[in-house]
Curated annotation (Swiss-Prot):
Domain of life: Bacteria
NCBIfam families: amidohydrolases (TIGR01891)
Protein name: Uncharacterized hydrolase SSP1352
EC number: 3.-.-.-
Keywords from the named record: Hydrolase
Gene3D superfamilies: 3.30.70.360, Zn peptidases
Enzyme class: hydrolase
Coiled coil: none
Length: 385
């Protein structure tokens, strides 16, 4: 089997059988079976996901991570390997991430069998990147405590960059992602007796207006921030004063101070609702993913790896506003995360992440494995000096 046949077969199987965050049971079995066939030892610290390990000719250990979960999206691609799971799709490319790491495991096992693997390697097939914070769950479960990991590397496919280009950036490359929720509780009445109630309709309208102005009036316009209102509702009938209201959304920023400003303003908005509308209002925050921080000390390995794998390196001036739970790995070791271009206009592979038409050429997965291998060589050369 050629490497192109390998990545095509595995990627398309995974694409046809996507599973949501924390439900990647069959995906986990598939990866485990692959590792069993290779004779690569592994552990399963959580119900889903796999941590594999190979010993090399060194005391140094590095790690590579691929996320394995999918999204609740109905696939609209008209391809033979279209998702067979209703309203679940690998719309963020994690099937590709997983397959590229599988190929790299296979290469490393071949090196290890010949006594030529230069470093110890931890291969992280991580569950629940989209929701659930799988990286943090693994860390809290002690999955890496026995591995003296010195560096962690990861990638993400990027359909807005042409195939063959890779976006890198030192320090923050993705934003933090924090969810917020407003809960409003008033008093219902018939619309004809509106004065007898305390309407959450007008109160929610006030909240929407004020939240919508936070970015304009309280944050530095030169910085890239998002205060997004994703879902809101109030009331149940057209002739009733709404007794409840609800708003939820997300905050994206790569500046901790800006996040605190947004939280403070939302708290003030919540407090103002009681005074203006006699409606109880509470805002709650759910801390999501911190910014992904790329350690500048690892840049030389990343750049060497990309150039030697014949990628064009693009240095991004500002971070993406995506949330990415790879950020948690910086708690255990220096880490570096890059975005690999997969755009192919000739084939119509142009739609963004989290869309129903996301697709890419499987051949790019071989080049990602090449990049992983070149990082291994670069890191080994420095450690041997």
């Amino acid at each position: 089997m050629t490497e192109l046949e390998f990545v095509t077969e595995h990627r398309r199987y995974l694409h046809k059988h996507p599973e949501l965050s924390l439900h990647e049971y069959e995906t986990t079995k598939y990866i485990a079976h692959f590792l069993d066939d290779l004779g690569v030892p592994y552990e399963r610290p959580l119900d889903t996901g796999v941590i594999a390990y190979l010993s090399g000719n060194s005391t140094h250990t590095i790690a590579y991570r691929a996320d394995i979960d999918a999204l609740p999206i109905y696939e609209e691609n008209n391809v033979s390997y279209r998702s067979e799971v209703d309203h679940v799709m690998h719309a963020c490319g994690h099937d590709g991430h997983t397959t590229a790491l599988m190929l790299f495991v296979k290469r490393c096992k071949n090196l290890a069998d010949k006594g030529e693997l230069p470093q110890n390697i931890v291969f992280i097939f991580q569950p629940a990147e989209e929701t659930g914070g799988g990286a943090n769950r693994l860390i809290r479960a002690g999955a890496f405590e026995k591995y003296p990991i010195e560096a962690v590397f990861g990638i993400h496919v990027m359909p807005f960059e042409n195939e063959g280009r890779v976006v890198i950036r030192d320090e923050e490359i993705t934003a933090s992602a924090t969810e917020y929720r407003f809960y409003l509780h008033g008093l219902s009445s018939h619309v004809a007796d509106k004065e007898q109630g305390h309407s959450c309709g007008e109160a929610l309208q006030h909240v929407l207006t004020q939240v919508g102005q936070i970015q304009q009036y309280h944050l530095n316009g030169l910085k890239r921030n998002i205060v997004h209102m994703g879902h809101f509702e109030a009331g149940e009938a057209i002739n009733t004063v709404p007794s409840n209201g609800y708003l939820e959304g997300t905050i994206r920023t790569y500046d901790v101070k800006d996040l605190e400003i947004v939280k403070q303003q939302m708290t003030k908005i919540s407090e103002s609702v009681k005074l203006l509308f006699n409606v109880e209002c509470e805002v709650k925050f759910e801390e999501g993913y911190p910014p992904t921080f790329n350690d500048p000390q690892l840049r030389k390995h990343v750049e060497n790896g990309l150039v030697n794998a014949e990628f064009e390196v693009i240095d991004k001036p500002t971070p993406y506003l995506f949330g990415e739970d790879f950020s948690f790995y910086s708690q255990i070791a220096p880490s570096y995360f890059v975005f690999v271009g997969v755009r192919d206009e000739a084939k119509g592979y142009v739609t963004g992440l989290h869309t129903s038409h996301l697709n890419f050429n499987e051949s790019i997965l071989i080049r990602i494995a090449d990049y992983y291998e070149q990082i291994l060589k670069s890191y080994s050369e420095v450690q041997s000096q």
